[in-house]
Amino acid sequence: MFGDDTESVLQAAAALVNTEPGASHSGADELTRIEDVAAFYAGWSYSGALARSERELAAVRAVREEVRRFFAESRDDAAEHVNRVLEQAAALPRLVKHDGYDWHLHAVPNDAPFDQRILVETAMAVSDLVRADELGRLKECAADDCTAVLVDLSRNRSKRFCDVGNCGNRTNVSAYRARRALGA
């Protein structure tokens, strides 16, 4: 559908947002320690510098809200957001090949701060969605009690629920019980 790097970056963006309180598996903030940032970095195969500092932790936590905005923006707003992010970072896209990955785009140097790389890589991936008129693949979970986000990579764009808290099943059970109560 999209390049592997685009899909991976979008899924990493959703995973980052879903570390927020209320969106995470635990319901608590899951990005509170330097080790949490390091685990996120390794888990999503980021490359480049990792400072492993309190400052970096604060910066990555702060960028979550800006990344979240991509999941709720209109196509025009997302395009403006992408342009603003790329301009502020003085992004210069270039093709790179490293660590067993085929050619893909990087837009900031490897020594750029991790939070900046997250935001710029997310913006580059979102630009693919904007150009393909597929921004609707970035969604907020349809469950009333969930604030998680998701990337819908299904062919028919039918995914409605996140993978964080069993939301689809809980919603279906609740609807079933409501129907039964009406019929009882």
Locate the predicted segments by residue.
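C-terminal structured interaction module
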Residues: 154-156, 175
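Short, cysteine/histidine-rich loop/knuckle motifs that typically chelate Zn2+
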Residues: 140-145, 164-166
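Basic DNA-binding region of bZIP-type proteins
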Residues: 166-183
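Short helix-coil boundary/hinge micro-motifs
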Residues: 1-140, 147-151, 184
